[in-house]
Amino acid sequence: MRAWCDYVRKNQKQRFQTYRQVCGCPYTSVGGELATQDKKVRLETQALIDRFVKYLSGAIADAITDGSAAPGDPQTKAKLVHAFVVGLLLRAKIYNDLKILSHLETGLFALIGAKIPKGPAK
């Protein structure tokens, strides 16, 4: 999970260096704007979100199984994590401030009931 947080920050930083703007999540930006206007876009955005939540759910289930995350429903936790991350990316985009993404790990690990591991991300 820490490596994924690092990936998100690195990806946003690279885009910022190119466009001089925090870009946020392209799927939810486009999906959020067009979902009420275009059913195909809405359905595709839903599919992307569902795929990502499924990935997160599996990672969270593994963390629960190995005792590094608190017991609970991995699917629910994954949906909460997704909503948190999308919200943080949107906030960073609105404020054009990458520092907002420094809270990614703290919030994510709190939502799944886990401690942030010491040392570098794996």
Briefly describe each language-model feature range.
Residues 18-40:
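Amphipathic alpha-helical segments used for helix-helix packing
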Residues 40-43, 71, 99-100:
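Structural helix-adjacent loops and short alpha-helical linkers that scaffold large soluble proteins
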